[in-house]
Swiss-Prot record:
Gene3D superfamilies tied to this protein: Tetratricopeptide repeat domain (1.25.40.10)
Biological process terms in GO annotation: RNA modification
Keywords, comma-separated and alphabetical: Mitochondrion, Repeat, Transit peptide
Protein's UniProt name: Pentatricopeptide repeat-containing protein At1g56690, mitochondrial
Region (Type E motif): 502-577
Gene Ontology molecular function terms on file: RNA binding; zinc ion binding
Protein species of origin: Arabidopsis thaliana (Mouse-ear cress)
Region entry Type E(+) motif, spans: 578-609
GO CC aspect terms: mitochondrion
Length: 704
């Protein structure tokens, strides 16, 4: 009877101990370590399992100091207790402490050794892991797998292969890992040999082999293997689909996608990205719209597709929809939207994205800083761009180039030169891109002497050989300064063949300074280089029109029709209340506020006439009467956008207008005068640069 009571008590204590250990572990797993400790302290009888559980709980909750204190208080320890201490330190990335405990252990088993090997592998200390592995008194299947898997993860495929061949038991997990490692190294045929030799394969093995073929651009072989796969899962279907999308075979991908029995989010995302890369925006949007569930990558892929194709308005629209649905934009999404904001000059959205980046602490990255600076520069907010630049004590070359390019596009040559001369003292030497930016700045600001000095010292001072882009900037600089003959001499002295940008710069100078003789030479060279470029025809027509050579204008226009060359349509846009309004020449018929815009145009036209404005009809090349030409000029897209800005934006707020082409001379003169008669600041970004109009003056000083 006494013996029976003893057995029952031991059974009770053991079962109670197991239950207590379970409760401590449960509380620890859900982060309630303090409750676990209270429960532990309340135990009248603390079994060794309970001690091990609470020590492990402290480690799991990132409290190694408290775990060690409890371990030291244990009156009795077994090998499980010591293993728990080693594993706990390893979980907390404290490999030195783990090794010290390992050396102090009164006894070790295969779990102790394997834990240390795994710990060293986790820390990237492969040499120590190998040394310990080969010292192990005995190894089990887990030991081999840990060492083998660590070598594969570290990219040591040759060593992994040798170890694989030595393994006493090659289970399906080990073989699958070996196949994956070999495929990542491009050794796909070697991987296939292992695959074919396997007696047992699971769905992961098949998918790994298919993925290996896909990663090595052998999509057709992957498809053959996929077709004979005994059991296909969502992952295997998706892997095969990715093979088509990542290799650019979007038609095959589309066909495969249609027959997929399940269409997981990752597969739909792949199709959106694939369609986006080949410009099939409507198909990408159809996939997007049909999705029941979307993740961050879905929105990012669709926004990127719009951005890549130049559908900036749709990208902004989608970003707004994303916010309404409470989806937090990812870093790549924010960068894509910043690029869109820069293109559209959408300052309000740009500021909003900047705030997102600050909240997510992404704004301390120099790459992000460069993108932000570009956005602010293109929105006409140069002061904000400079503030971003000044935040960084250590700047990379891209940041320097961004701010110099920004000053250049705004015609602020002095500021650009100041920044340029600060570069060497900061430890950053100008590169090819920097020199293009500073030469452009000198050209736009009329800094001929400084610009020529930089150009002539490029090789000796900065070790940069002039490229065709540098020559183009210098030709433009000379041409803007009226030194058209010297510009031609520079072209003739070039050691590299001048391209269309060089001849285009000369042709632009010929227009500004009425050099019809050299204009014909430049135009001929441009027609040879870019026979389909409508800009050359238009510029030559404009030069002839300015000299009233209407017969020559007609010849140029006829040649355009003969060669099927059409002029790229001009458009301008303005952001009002987080909405971008787009205008084309004369194109306000579909605008909901058409009548009010026309009234504002009539009002400004009247003010201009009173101020003595005389339209320059040479900028209208159509064969129509003078009255129609005058009316056509006032309907240029930039004039429509300015009128809308006057109509909608309150006084004191700058009117920011963007245009995809170079502003014509008449619109430039008209907007200058509009800024005076309306007492409004107008900022116009055209294809070449920024124009800041204020009180009848322009920042370009009519030098553009």
């Amino acid at each position: 009877m006494k013996r029976l009571k003893l057995i029952l008590r031991r059974t009770y204590l053991t079962s109670t101990g197991v239950n207590c250990s379970f409760e401590i572990s449960r509380l620890s797993r859900i982060g309630k370590i303090n409750e676990a400790r209270k429960f532990f302290d309340s135990l009248q009888f603390k079994a060794i399992g309970s001690w091990n559980s609470i020590v492990s709980g402290y480690f799991s909750n990132g409290l190694p100091k408290e775990a060690r204190q409890l371990f030291d208080e244990m009156s009795e320890r077994n090998v499980v207790s010591w293993n728990g201490l080693v594993s706990g330190y390893i979980k907390n990335r404290m490999i030195v402490e783990a090794r010290n405990v390992f050396e102090l252990m009164p006894e070790r088993n295969v779990v102790s050794w394997t834990a240390m090997v795994k710990g060293y592998m986790q820390e990237g200390m492969v040499g120590e892991a190998e040394s310990l592995f080969w010292r192990m008194p005995e190894r089990n299947e887990v030991s081999w797998t840990v060492m083998f898997g660590g070598l594969i993860d570290d990219g040591r495929i040759d060593k992994a292969r040798k170890l694989y061949d030595m393994m006493p038991v090659k289970d399906v997990v080990a073989s699958t890992n070996m196949i994956g490692g070999l495929c990542r190294e491009g050794r796909v045929d070697e991987a296939r040999l292992i695959f074919d030799e396997m007696r047992e394969r699971n769905v992961v093995t098949w998918t790994t082999m298919i993925t290996g073929y896909r990663q090595n651009n052998r999509v057709d072989v992957a498809r053959k293997l996929f077709e004979v796969m005994p059991e296909k899962t969502e992952v295997s279907w998706t892997s095969m689909l990715l093979g088509y999308t990542l290799s650019g075979r979007i038609e095959d991908a589309e066909e495969f996608f249609e027959v997929m029995p399940m269409k997981p989010v990752i597969a739909c995302n792949a199709m959106i990205v694939g369609f986006g890369e080949v410009g099939e925006i409507s198909k990408a949007r159809r996939v997007f719209d049909l999705m029941e569930d979307r993740d961050n990558a879905t929105w990012r892929g669709m926004i990127k597709a719009y951005e890549r194709k130049g559908f900036e308005l749709e990208a902004l629209d989608l970003f707004a929809q994303m916010q309404k649905q409470g989806v937090r934009p990812s870093f790549p999404s924010l960068i894509s939207i910043l690029s869109v904001c820069a293109t559209l000059a959408s300052l309000q959205y740009g500021r909003q994205v900047h705030a997102h980046l600050v909240r997510c602490q992404f704004d301390d990255d120099v790459y992000v800083a460069s993108v932000l600076m570009t956005m602010y520069v293109k929105c006409g907010e140069l002061v904000k761009a400079k503030l971003v630049f000044d935040r960084f004590s250590s700047k990379d070359i891209i940041m320097w180039n961004s701010i110099i390019s920004g000053y250049a596009s705004h015609g602020l040559g002095e500021e650009a030169l100041k920044i340029f001369h600060e570069m060497p003292s900061s430890g950053t030497m100008p590169n090819k891109v920097t020199l293009i930016a500073i030469l452009t700045a000198c050209s736009y600001a009329g800094k001929l002497e400084e610009g020529l000095e930089i150009f002539e010292s490029m090789e000796s001072k900065f070790c940069v050989t002039p490229t065709v882009e540098h020559y183009s900037c210098t030709v433009d600089m000379l041409g803007r300064a009226g030194q058209v003959d010297k510009a031609m001499e520079l072209i003739e002295s070039m050691t590299i063949k001048p391209d269309a940008t060089v001849w285009g710069a000369l042709l632009g100078a010929c227009k500004t300074h009425s050099r019809l003789d050299l204009a014909e030479v430049a135009a001929k060279k441009l027609f040879e280089n870019e026979p389909d470029n409508a800009g050359t025809y238009v510029l030559l027509s404009s030069i002839n029109a300015s000299r009233s050579k209407w017969g020559d204008v007609a010849v140029v226009r006829k040649n355009m029709r003969t060669n099927n060359v059409s002029k790229f349509p001009g458009c301008s846009w303005i952001e009002v209340g987080k909405k971008v309004h787009m205008f084309t020449r004369g194109g306000i018929k579909n605008h909901p506020e058409q009548a009010m815009i026309l009234m504002m145009l009539e009002k400004t036209d009247g003010l201009l006439r009173e101020a003595g404005y005389s339209p320059d009809c040479s900028h209208v090349l159509h064969d129509v009467d003078e009255e129609e030409k005058v009316d056509s000029l006032s309907r240029h897209s930039e004039r429509l956008a300015v009128a809308y800005g006057l109509l909608k934006l309150p006084e004191g707020v700058p009117i920011r207008v963007m245009k995809n082409l170079r502003v014509c001379g008449d619109c430039h003169a008209a907007i200058k005068l509009i800024s005076k008669v309306t007492e409004r600041e107008i900022i116009l970004r055209d294809a070449n640069r920024f124009h800041h109009f204020n009180n009848g003056e322009c920042s370009c000083r009519d030098y553009w």
